[in-house]
């Protein structure tokens, strides 16, 4: 069920275009997303603010609103609103994987919209892991990016904890650049190591203070660091 539209909403609906929630009343077990990096949500401000003020936590944006120049966390709140009920509430729960730049992790002082959203996610024990990816993976930007794993069905050993995986050296230099994309993560084909499988194992094993040397990572790029870590905190 693919829907074309503006996920956040503008309050200006038009034919063939879903303005706001394109899947009202629906919930999903798994969700993947790569929202735009650092894009302002000024066109959606009135619609989103009205939903926040009118519905609070019964709507999509109850925990707070980020600053106007970056709407990334609004997309995450939208996806969280689409989660299946947690197992302890009689449901099967959901898991979200979303790719962000560093802004949703670091911007916003205590009490700001970004800080309140992060606090709400962590206090409700939904942040399962953050995976730091290599830079230069995207065509239009060379920045470092991060995968957030968000879920309401944590395994018992993960409850109250967040796994941090530093995978910034899991990269393979490409022979030919494509815009700003100069690296890719190896998948075991074309003579590359299987970086994707290695990161998946680190995530699945949930071991504390795992350290891998550059030789073990098998990168053809001179890394800034001589180690990569998987940490649980």
Place the predicted regions along the sequence by residue:
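Conserved SAM-binding strand-loop segment of SAM-dependent methyltransferases
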Residues: 2-7
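A conserved structural/catalytic subdomain of Rossmann-like adenosyl-cofactor enzymes
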Residues: 9-10, 14-233
């Amino acid at each position: 069920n693919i829907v074309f539209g503006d996920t956040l909403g503008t309050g200006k609906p038009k034919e063939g275009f879903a303005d706001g929630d394109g899947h009202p009343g629906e919930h999903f077990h798994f969700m993947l997303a790569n929202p735009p990096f650092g894009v302002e949500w000024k066109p959606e401000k009135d619609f989103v603010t009205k939903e926040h003020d009118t519905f609070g936590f019964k709507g999509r944006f109850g925990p707070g609103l980020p600053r106007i120049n970056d709407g990334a966390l609004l997309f995450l709140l939208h996806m969280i609103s689409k989660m299946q009920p947690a197992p302890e509430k009689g449901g099967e729960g959901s898991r979200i994987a979303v790719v962000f730049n560093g802004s949703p992790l670091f911007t916003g002082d205590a009490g700001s919209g970004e800080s309140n959203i992060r606090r709400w996610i962590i206090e409700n024990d939904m942040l399962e892991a953050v995976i730091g990816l290599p830079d230069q993976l995207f065509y239009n930007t060379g920045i470092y990016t991060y995968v957030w794993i968000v879920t309401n069905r944590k395994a018992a050993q993960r409850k109250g904890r967040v796994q941090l995986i530093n995978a910034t050296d899991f990269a393979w230099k490409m022979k030919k650049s494509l815009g700003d994309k100069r690296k890719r993560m190896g998948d075991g084909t074309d003579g590359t190591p299987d970086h994707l499988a290695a990161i998946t194992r680190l995530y699945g094993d949930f071991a504390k203070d795992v350290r891998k040397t550059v030789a073990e990572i098998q990168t053809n790029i001179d890394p800034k660091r001589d180690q990569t870590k998987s940490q649980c905190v």
